[in-house]
């Protein structure tokens, strides 16, 4: 296999050396941190937080075979961006931007 070929059996690796599972984990890390502030929590986030797959808490990409974590981040990127912008959290904004650009 050449250095330019993609191995299909590697979860979350669509481009060489891009770890989309970890990128999604970092976004969720930031989301949970921002939501610790009660002024940022609302009914929407109360519904989203329980949807975080077990693989996130285990930090195990192999247990997230359906890529649920990445799907959760990418399908909610607009709302995550709004949350992070409202909180004026540059670290979270940058993490989301990286995940969107590399993985979504």
Swiss-Prot record:
Keywords: Nitrogen fixation. It comes from the Bacteria. One of its GO terms (biological process) is nitrogen fixation. The keyword Flavoprotein does not apply. It holds the Pfam family CowN. The keyword Chaperone does not apply. Belongs to the CowN family. Is required to sustain N(2)-dependent growth in the presence of low levels of carbon monoxide (CO). Probably acts by protecting the N(2) fixation ability of the nitrogenase complex, which is inactivated in the presence of CO. This is N(2)-fixation sustaining protein CowN. It comes from Arcobacter nitrofigilis (strain ATCC 33309 / DSM 7299 / CCUG 15893 / LMG 7604 / NCTC 12251 / CI) (Campylobacter nitrofigilis). The gene is cowN.
């Amino acid at each position: 296999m050449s250095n330019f070929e993609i191995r299909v059996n590697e979860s979350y690796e669509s481009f060489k050396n891009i770890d989309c599972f970890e990128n999604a984990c970092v976004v969720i890390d930031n989301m949970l941190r921002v939501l610790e502030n009660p002024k940022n929590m609302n009914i929407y986030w109360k519904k989203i937080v329980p949807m975080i797959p077990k693989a996130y808490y285990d930090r195990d990409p192999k247990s997230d075979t359906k890529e649920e974590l990445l799907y959760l981040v990418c399908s909610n990127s607009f709302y995550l961006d709004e949350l992070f912008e409202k909180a004026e959290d540059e670290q979270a904004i940058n993490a989301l931007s990286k995940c969107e650009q590399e993985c979504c």
